[in-house]
Amino acid sequence: MTIIFQFALVALVLVSFVLVVGVPVAYATPQNWVESKKLLWLGSGVWIALVLLVGLLNFFVV
């Protein structure tokens, strides 16, 4: 269970880093806004799912 928690936590950190870099870039480039908007929604959904997963796994690991 601990290894799953660690993988989920690393995935959360990586997705967070990608969103911190990618969101301002997506807002600064208006050329492909339709495609960027879909990716932003997808990234946000993945981030929320990972936050919930890490919280749930933290309950079981600790």
Swiss-Prot record:
GO annotation, biological process: photosynthesis; photosystem II stabilization
Key words, A-Z: Membrane, Photosynthesis, Photosystem II, Reaction center, Thylakoid, Transmembrane, Transmembrane helix
SUPFAM superfamilies, alphabetized: PsbZ-like (SSF161055)
Protein's UniProt keywords contain Membrane: yes
Subcellular locations according to the entry: Cellular thylakoid membrane
Topology relative to the membrane: Multi-pass membrane protein
Transmembrane annotation, as ranges: 8-28, 41-61
Main location: membrane
Coiled coil: none
Record carries keyword Transmembrane: yes
InterPro entries assigned to the protein according to its UniProt record, in alphabetical order: PSII_PsbZ, PSII_PsbZ_sf
A single cellular component GO annotation: photosystem II reaction center
Alphabetical list of HAMAP family matching this protein: PSII_PsbZ
Function: May control the interaction of photosystem II (PSII) cores with the light-harvesting antenna, regulates electron flow through the 2 photosystem reaction centers. PSII is a light-driven water plastoquinone oxidoreductase, using light energy to abstract electrons from H(2)O, generating a proton gradient subsequently used for ATP formation.
Subunit structure: PSII is composed of 1 copy each of membrane proteins PsbA, PsbB, PsbC, PsbD, PsbE, PsbF, PsbH, PsbI, PsbJ, PsbK, PsbL, PsbM, PsbT, PsbX, PsbY, PsbZ, Psb30/Ycf12, peripheral proteins PsbO, CyanoQ (PsbQ), PsbU, PsbV and a large number of cofactors. It forms dimeric complexes.
Family (UniProt): Belongs to the PsbZ family.
PANTHER family documented for this protein: PHOTOSYSTEM II REACTION CENTER PROTEIN Z
Name of the protein this chain belongs to: Photosystem II reaction center protein Z
Origin organism lineage: Bacteria, Bacillati, Cyanobacteriota, Cyanophyceae, Nostocales
The gene coding this protein: psbZ
